[in-house]
């Protein structure tokens, strides 16, 4: 702390920090000298604070066997039953038919809800009009776990939407408010909450507009080392050869977007890599063009059923995570 003060950087309370295998993080105003800051004992790296963005611009059937008319995996009981999938995004329209408990009721979120185990609204309270990337979160959540309530009540397999894992449950974490995307400083906060709900696979269709290996990337990598049974799927962006953070981690799954067809091709805007370090970029491709999924309407109790189409690695990533 004294070393930092000597170069004009003031951080209080460092003596009360508890031990953690994860690096402690401090946000400060730009110091007089980055070179001096990097020479302070214990400083691992310095990076700019950037702005986070979303990555979006009959997929499950193509993922199964390439035939739009069949869902062979469902016939073998491979529908995500008993699996908890997590996603952090722009909010969820929880009264949508993909998620609500009955035709006329949302139900109480928790272990007795048919879809949503956790809906973390500590930052914001839903997928709201006027907020950045309105409808993005509801769409990706539908791609993860949608089972239309009317099909569910009639004990039918899904007939709309795009998810393979219609039997899965969801942990949703709203990280967008009227101020934009505000993911926690430590993404492990999201991963811990997901893990406590028995979640293993976590889907993230967002990140900062940089190809650098960031503090957030390191968090995802460290989490996978400490908890090797968990896996994070991350959208790499829609920038062609560039691979945006945190999909450039070594222990995450970066998913590129393909066309939605029996003989798919790489979508021309999909990020592919390699990383700045020259390592492989995307791990796999999943359908990411004109993906139909849940459409938010911004009304808390409309009991809406509408779908909408969207494209991008944002759409491909939850489809791969539900595979």
Could you describe each region identified by the protein language model?
Residues 3-84:
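Autoinhibitory propeptides
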Residues 9, 39-42, 92, 145-149, ...:
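Sec-exported extracytoplasmic/periplasmic mature domains
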Residues 31-34, 40, 137, 141, ...:
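Extracytoplasmic/secreted envelope proteins and their assembly/folding machinery
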Residues 49, 173-174, 203-207, 233-237, ...:
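A cross-family glycoside hydrolase active-site/sugar-binding cleft signature
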Residues 72-120, 124-184, 197-200, 210-213, ...:
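Subtilisin-like serine protease catalytic core
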Residues 91-93, 207-209, 236-241, 260-261, ...:
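Catalytic metal-binding/acid-base residues of hydrolase active sites
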Residues 123, 259-318:
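Catalytic-core environment of secreted peptidases
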Residues 170, 191-217, 234-236:
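Short acidic, glycine-rich surface-loop motifs adjacent to enzyme active sites
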């Amino acid at each position: 702390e004294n070393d930092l003060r000597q170069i004009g950087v003031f951080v209080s309370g460092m003596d009360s920090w508890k031990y953690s295998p994860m690096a402690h993080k401090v946000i400060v105003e730009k110091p007089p000298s980055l070179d001096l800051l990097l020479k302070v004992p214990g400083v691992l790296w310095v990076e700019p604070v950037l702005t986070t963005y979303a990555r979006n611009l009959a997929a499950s059937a193509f993922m199964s066997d390439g035939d739009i008319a069949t869902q062979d995996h469902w016939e073998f009981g491979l529908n995500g039953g008993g699996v908890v999938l997590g996603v952090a995004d722009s909010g969820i329209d929880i009264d949508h038919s993909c998620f609500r408990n009955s035709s006329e009721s949302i139900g109480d979120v928790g272990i007795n809800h048919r879809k949503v185990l956790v809906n973390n609204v500590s930052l914001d309270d839903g997928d709201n009009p006027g907020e950045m990337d309105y409808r993005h979160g509801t769409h990706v959540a539908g791609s993860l776990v949608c089972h239309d309530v009317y099909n569910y009540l009639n004990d039918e397999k899904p007939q709309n939407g795009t998810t393979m894992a219609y039997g899965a449950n969801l942990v949703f974490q709203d990280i967008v408010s009227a101020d934009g995307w505000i993911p926690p400083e430590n993404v492990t906060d999201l991963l811990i909450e997901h893990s406590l709900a028995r979640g293993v696979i976590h889907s993230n269709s967002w990140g900062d507009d940089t190809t650098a290996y960031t503090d957030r990337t390191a968090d995802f990598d460290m989490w996978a080392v400490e908890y090797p049974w968990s896996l994070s799927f991350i959208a790499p962006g829609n920038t062609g050869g560039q691979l945006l953070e945190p999909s450039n981690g070594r222990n995450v799954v970066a998913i590129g977007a393909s066309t939605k067809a029996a003989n798919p091709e790489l979508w021309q805007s999909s990020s592919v890599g390699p990383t700045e370090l020259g390592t492989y970029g995307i791990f796999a491709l999943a359908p990411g063009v004109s993906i139909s999924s849940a459409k938010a309407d911004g009304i808390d109790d409309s009991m809406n059923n509408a779908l909408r189409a969207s494209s991008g690695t944002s759409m491909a990533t939850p489809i791969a995570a539900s595979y």
